[in-house]
């Protein structure tokens, strides 16, 4: 047992024979497996669709700005919400992180200047103790489901499991989701009833 990390590896497709998963095919090799967990966030549906699994997980883009603090007395001490712009502002050591927004624009990670201006305006208006010119600007895709609940559980293909669709709460739900999926893969009964988390709820 144990874990082997494979950096720089791209999963190209699932290896499925009949109604059973046999492993995955990567850009380097074929990896045999008794069970496969698809945990690719917003990209999960792209891997599954060729196998007839319709997964309603959609990419919803969010933006963040990380700003170095130049005046600690004019920086936040704890996390706050700017309800006008629906943006969270928090302190990360000697930096201010401001993030939020929800944009439906497909699988794009482009960084629009208007979004940056909104983030800068929000944080600098409330906490002018940072150097916005030195900020790092980032966007990412949140894997959202229609009902806001993640998809965790088995699929119609034996040995193929899903752990995706956590939306904005990926880190928050990561440990609990990992426990549930580990139990399901191992044939144990999870501590919670996970029936309604499976993709079959959308059938």
Curated annotation (Swiss-Prot):
Record-level GO cellular component terms: cytoplasm; plasma membrane
A GO biological-process term: D-alanine catabolic process
Matching InterPro entries: FAD-dep_OxRdtase, FAD/NAD-bd_sf
Any GO molecular function: D-amino-acid dehydrogenase activity
UniProt keywords, alphabetically: Oxidoreductase, Plasmid
Pfam hit, one: DAO
Origin: domain of life: Bacteria
UniProt-listed SUPFAM superfamilies: FAD-linked reductases, C-terminal domain (SSF54373), FAD/NAD(P)-binding domain (SSF51905)
EC number from the UniProt entry: 1.-.-.-
Similarity field: Belongs to the DadA oxidoreductase family.
General function of this protein: Either a functional dehydrogenase or a non-functional fragment.
Name of this protein: Uncharacterized oxidoreductase y4sL
Organism: Sinorhizobium fredii (strain NBRC 101917 / NGR234)
Organism lineage: Bacteria, Pseudomonadati, Pseudomonadota, Alphaproteobacteria, Hyphomicrobiales
